[in-house]
Amino acid sequence: MYPLTRDFPKPLLKVAGRPVLDYLMQQLLECPYLEGVYVVTNARFFNHFCLWKEGWDLHTGRRGIEMKVYNNGVKYDHSRLGALRDLAFVLDQFASLERAVVAAGDNIFCFPLSPIWQRFIFGNVNYVIALFETDKDRLRRTGIVELGPDDRVIRFYEKPNEPLSFWISPAIYFLQRSALMRVKEYLSFSSMHDAPGYFLEYLVNKEPVYAVRVKGRVLDIGSIDSYRNADRMLSVEPFRLSE
């Protein structure tokens, strides 16, 4: 994404006139009983996210939702923690956390999250999202799930060279407390700290994880081309939660 992200964080790049992360925030604010939104970033971009947060303070305050931006202290790319160690860093800020939605900041999820959230908070089950995809190049660039009875996830593959399923699972995971407690367990032996999908590969062998099949699409802002395509697409067809 260089040079666009040389001095600016990718989740705050504007797509159709709005920061990428705004789309996720809009969806989260539609979720009942949401208690908090927590963003972790590095020291370089901490002030960028703090300014972005100010634009949401009124909306979250009205709903009684706590919102914080955490600085992981990292100043240079070569010392980056990776997404999973960032997650562990945030989890350390809480004495207890019953459940959480863990999401990448550079994806736009073009389908409502609230129905999945409501199923999640009124149960004791871990969920991922499954979208049908036949394009092999796209299948190789994301998480893939193999589904069993009742849509339980039998296997999770992070960016496989040879996809064994047509169900993609984007980087948004609905995790109960028992699953969140396994993040440090995973990090204690694995060197795969970056993509959170590697943790899901581990988790599905330890705890039940189920897929929610949805219709829609995910815009992954992973390259300049995908960024421009997302901007063009959402400029023509505005984002709507009801789709």
Where are these regions (language model features)?
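N-terminal nucleotide-binding beta1-loop-alpha1 segment
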Residues: 1-7, 12, 27, 66, ...
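Short glycine-enriched, charge-decorated loop/helix-capping segments at active-site entrances
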Residues: 7-12, 74-76, 187-189
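Conserved N-terminal catalytic core of the sugar/cofactor nucleotidyltransferase
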Residues: 14, 18-102, 113-115
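A short acidic, often aromatic-flanked loop/helix-cap motif at beta-alpha or helix-coil junctions
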Residues: 72-79, 137, 162, 218-220
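The conserved acidic donor/metal-binding loop of glycosyltransferases
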Residues: 105-108
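Conserved donor-nucleotide/metal-binding helix-loop-beta segment in metal-dependent transferases, i.e.
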Residues: 111-140
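Catalytic-core segments of class I nucleotidyltransferases/pyrophosphorylases
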Residues: 117-121, 152-220, 224-242
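Short acidic-glycine loop/turn motifs at beta-strand connectors
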Residues: 146-152
